[in-house]
From Swiss-Prot:
The gene is HNL. This is (S)-hydroxynitrile lyase. Residues 5-241 form the AB hydrolase-1 domain. It comes from Hevea brasiliensis (Para rubber tree). PANTHER family: AB HYDROLASE-1 DOMAIN-CONTAINING PROTEIN, METHYLESTERASE FAMILY MEMBER. The N-terminus is blocked.
Length: 257
């Protein structure tokens, strides 16, 4: 059994806390696990209005990878919109990434602008229910921010999670942004960087926000090296199918680490 260093990457409006069930399980198996708070997320003191792009939002991940000792490699695990953080990081530090796991996640490609998969998500799932939106200006650019609605959280993200998990999400989610208009003008992700890393895609057809239509489209659009389909669960597989995700990550470590 191989041991790996997993770096867990949360989605927008969330924080490292989303991994609280998976992290100790992986550590009990002997793995090293780092769960990061991205900019203006979790306990990071910045506010989203201070952040002007998905790249700036990814700064804690980039800083972490920069500081890794020479020769050390990690396995990135990104949930939901965390796939964009993976792509940004891989373009800068592909030599430090043994593999990347996309957990019910956006899967960017290298043939279209970085907003391409987000645009498709919005086409497939346009109604974010009671989510509230606002605009702010950073570096002369108008950015749309959002605060996830409690109905959306319960019905579409934490669909099968227990009441405690849902309460945690209501208490700890913060304002965030998809930076969709900024991503639309960002340079494409590169074949030499992001395109060169091993990609593992994990999904369930019971996801109520990343619908099967969207997930199957992503798999076809930018074929990953390996696909795992989890039976049951919801958008937050790390909470509803924790054991199954840990088993998949062990297999990833055995294969790619």
């Amino acid at each position: 059994m191989a041991f790996a260093h997993f770096v867990l990457i949360h989605t927008i409006c969330h924080g490292a806390w989303i991994w609280h069930k998976l992290k100790p399980l992986l550590e009990a198996l002997g793995h090293k696990v780092t769960a990061l708070d991205l900019a203006a997320s979790g306990v990071d003191p910045r506010q989203i209005e201070e952040i002007g792009s998905f790249d700036e939002y990814s700064e804690p991940l980039l800083t972490f990878l920069e500081a890794l000792p020479p020769g050390e490699k990690v396995i990135l695990v990104g949930e939901s919109c965390g796939g964009l953080n993976i792509a940004i990081a891989a373009d800068k530090y592909c030599e430090k990434i043994a593999a990347a796991v996309f957990h019910n996640s956006v899967l960017p490609d290298t043939e279209h602008c970085p907003s391409y998969v987000v645009d498709k998500l919005m086409e497939v799932f346009p109604d974010w229910k009671d989510t509230t939106y606002f605009t702010y200006t950073k570096d002369g650019k108008e950015i749309t921010g959002l605060k996830l609605g409690f109905t959306l959280l319960r019905e579409n993200l934490y669909t099968l999670c227990g009441p405690e998990e849902y309460e945690l999400a209501k208490m700890l989610t913060r304002k965030g942004s998809l930076f969709q208009n900024i991503l639309a003008k960002r340079p494409f992700f590169t074949k030499e960087g992001y395109g060169s890393i091993k990609k593992i895609y994990v999904w369930t057809d019971q996801d109520e926000i990343f619908l099967p239509e969207f997930q199957l489209w992503q798999i076809e659009n930018y074929k990953p090296d390996k696909v795992y389909k989890v039976e049951g669960g919801d958008h937050k597989l790390q909470l509803t199918k924790t054991k199954e995700i840990a088993e998949i990550l062990q297999e990833v470590a055995d294969t790619y680490n």
